Amino acid sequence: MRIIPAGLEVPQIGECFVGSGVNAAHINTVLGHRSGPAGVAWATALATPSEGHVPFVAVLRPSLPVKPLTLFVTKSAPADDSHGLLIWGPAQAGVAAGVADAVAAGTISVDAADTHALIAAVWVNPKADDADEVYRNNRQAICTAIANGAAKMPDLHDVLSARHSPSNPFYTPPADNADSRQEN
C-alpha cells in the first residue's frame, strides 16, 4: 500500500460547458491541497500574469473571497471595457457563488475549504451580451465542473465511445472525417 504524504495528493480536475451562444460558460477547474501541486500552480499563476490575462481571487463581495480560495483565470483577454466588466462582474460573481454552492452541497468538504486551493479557467465570450445569463451559466458551470472532478468524470467508456463523433459548440467535423474507424 502506498501512502501519499499530506498535500501531495493528486489534484481533482473538472470541466463543464453550460449554455449556448455568446453567453455560454466553459470552465476548467483544478482543486488540490495548498501545500501540493495545485497550491504551487495557484501561487505561480497569481504571481506571473501575462498581458491580457491577470488572474485574481474570486470574491463573493469586496474583501470576502470565496473558500476554498479560488483563482479566476481568464481564457480570453478583455476585448473592450464591456467585455472586461462581464469578466469582473457577472462571471466572477457566478464563479464565487458556484464554489460556495459546491461547499454548501458537500462536494467540497468544509475542512477542504480552508486547506485547498481552486484554479478556475473561465471563458467569457467577447461578444457576450447578457450579464444575468453569464452569471447563471458560470455559477452552474463551476459547481458542475467541481462535481465532475470529484467524481473523476468523464467515464473512460464515454470518452472512447465519443471518439468517432467529436463535436463542440464551435465545430463538428463532417461524418466522413469524424469517424476514422481506426481501432487503436
Predicted feature residues:
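Accessory interaction regions appended to the cores of large information-processing enzymes
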Residues: M1-N184
